Amino acid sequence: MTALLYYVQNDTDGAGHRLPLSQRRLGRILSLLTENGLSKIDREINLLPAGHPAKGPYGLFLQAKENLRGNIVIGLGKRLNVFQDKLVDALTADSSIDLTLPGHKPCAYFCILSAQDSTYAFLSSLFFTMIFSRLEQYARRETEDGKLPIPVNFVLDEFPSIGKLGDFKRSIAFTRGFRMNCIVIVQSIAQLADMYPRHEWEEIAACCDATICLGVNDLTSAKFVS
């Protein structure tokens, strides 16, 4: 996956110019696997110049036994199968959403998710992971005091439905320093512990200065608020 990401991200046309973003999208990785096959991908990677970022990860992939490589490709294809949905492919084909806008202009972004179907949870997880990162970068690079000009409030209702956020325990710990505030809303502590196991959920809860409990129906939540 890493090798193909680097390959697609840095792909160029015949004149050596990078392809448009719409042709360097995540859905193209699925196309490479289903339309080209592993043998053609081998040839394409071999033609890349020395030092290309795709060569290193692909070299590690080639160290696996041949039958294992096939299983890796099949597994990757299954995980990327969601990109057969044209709407998902189109949504990830460009970067029209300004992730830094909330930090310097009053606005509101709404992410409407299904609480029952987790098929597209990776998209919401990616969105929130990226917006935390971009706002942090904006505060560090574009402001004198390292703080966002406009405070950004994240109301994370049905938090587990968002999908697991990469290194969220770190994000929620540093956000206030950049004028970002998180309101984490869950139906039970057990939900949070299931999504962020091994005491990670406790670190997240510890970063919340205030806790409001509207009622509990499980022992784990009851013990936490008692």
Predicted regions and their residues:
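P-loop NTPase motor domains
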Residues: M1-M180
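P-loop NTPase motor core of the ASCE superfamily
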Residues: L5-Y6, T100, P106-C107, K169-A173, ...
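Structural recognition of the beta-strand scaffold that forms the well-ordered cores
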Residues: F110, C182-V184, I212-C213
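Histidine- and/or cysteine-centered catalytic micro-motif in compact active-site loops
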Residues: S114, F159, Q187-I189, V216
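Sensor-1/coupling segment of RecA-like P-loop NTPase cores
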Residues: T175-M195
